[in-house]
């Protein structure tokens, strides 16, 4: 998290205080990550003046899956199945907004770009994804994050073609246009390519977990992306044009790193008590001070694989150099003689 902390009196007009943003981000990661059952084991918060108008949040996940399941390729006549959360007006233009220039009016004009998340729904979708994967019930899957159905179906059908029936998509409420249905983004909604012979079992599996699954089209070997709304064709583009039709944007930039100067440190001899105030200033710096208040909000023990944890030491109150996760926790693999050292 890259944030700037400064007094309210020094903020530019229309800028929300960075401290409020920081607490909101911390709470968002906590509430979503903990409910999803994903261990949050590492992170950093960096404070700098340059982030006063545009704080940055970088997130990353590391996962593992069987090698034979690491490739995805929709097959002709595979059903396009929407699974998870319903479609609403929230999350429209979220991907483009995140890269846009922010102004004092952005909060009002672009409020709809923010997704209304539901961690519980996504957790159930994740459980379905893993069970259906192990049973070999789908040939490809993509999330509806940036771009919604438009990016998910467009990406999956690039080498094949797709026909989408937008009026079949489950909606949160009535009144959405087919354009809004097509581009609305949601992290807890995913698109699966399901062979027709597996649809009955796939639907049964989703029902067992109370997860909504609806067929909204099929992948067809036409090389085109066709969108239909109540039997009317509202868009028809070739996949080649969709992915390669626009000339690539080429930009040139020159990076000139600043010189750190002489890195040598001058040692000053004298009474150590004279340096107490300087030491307290360093320890009080937001970039140096303890981040335990953030770390303790995150569940880094879930799944039972955390061997080296974020905080170490006798009192478990000092930051460690790194975290270590055991990839396949099993009681048979644990050495009881070494367990106390990992407690």
Where are these regions (language model features)?
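Short, small-residue-biased leader/transition segments that mark boundaries at the very start
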Residues: 1-3, 329-333, 338-343
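Glycine/proline-enriched, intrinsically flexible loops and inter-domain linkers
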Residues: 4-328, 332
């Amino acid at each position: 998290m890259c944030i700037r902390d400064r007094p309210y009196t020094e903020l530019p007009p229309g800028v929300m205080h960075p401290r409020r943003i920081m607490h909101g981000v911390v709470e968002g990661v906590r509430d979503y990550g903990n409910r999803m059952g994903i261990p949050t084991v590492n992170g950093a918060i960096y404070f700098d003046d340059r982030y006063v108008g545009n704080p940055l949040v970088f997130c990353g996940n590391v996962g593992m899956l069987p090698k034979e399941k690491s490739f995805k390729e929709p097959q002709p006549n595979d059903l396009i199945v929407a699974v998870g959360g319903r479609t609403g007006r929230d999350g429209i233009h979220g991907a483009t907004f995140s890269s846009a220039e922010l102004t004092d009016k952005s909060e009002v004009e672009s409020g709809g770009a923010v997704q209304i998340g539901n961690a519980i729904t996504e957790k159930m979708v994740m459980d379905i994804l893993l069970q259906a994967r192990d049973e070999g019930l789908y040939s490809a899957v993509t999330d509806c994050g940036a771009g919604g159905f438009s990016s998910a179906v467009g990406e999956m059908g690039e080498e094949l073609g797709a026909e989408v029936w937008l009026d079949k998509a489950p909606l949160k409420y009535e009144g959405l246009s087919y354009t809004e249905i097509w581009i609305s983004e949601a992290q807890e909604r995913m698109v699966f390519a399901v062979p027709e012979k597996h649809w009955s079992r796939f639907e049964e599996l989703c029902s067992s977990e109370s997860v909504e699954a609806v067929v909204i089209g099929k992948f067809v070997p036409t090389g085109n992306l066709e969108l239909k709304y109540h039997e009317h064709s509202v868009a028809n583009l070739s996949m080649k044009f969709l992915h390669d039709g626009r000339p690539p944007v080429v930009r040139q930039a020159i990076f000139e790193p600043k010189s750190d100067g002489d890195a040598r440190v001058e040692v000053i001899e004298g009474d150590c008590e004279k340096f107490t105030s300087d030491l307290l200033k360093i320890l009080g710096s937001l970039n140096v001070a303890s981040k335990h208040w953030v770390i303790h909000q995150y569940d880094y023990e879930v799944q039972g694989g955390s061997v080296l944890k974020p905080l170490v030491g006798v009192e478990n109150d000092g930051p460690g150099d790194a975290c270590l996760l055991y990839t396949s926790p099993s009681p048979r693999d644990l050495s009881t003689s070494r367990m106390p050292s990992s407690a």
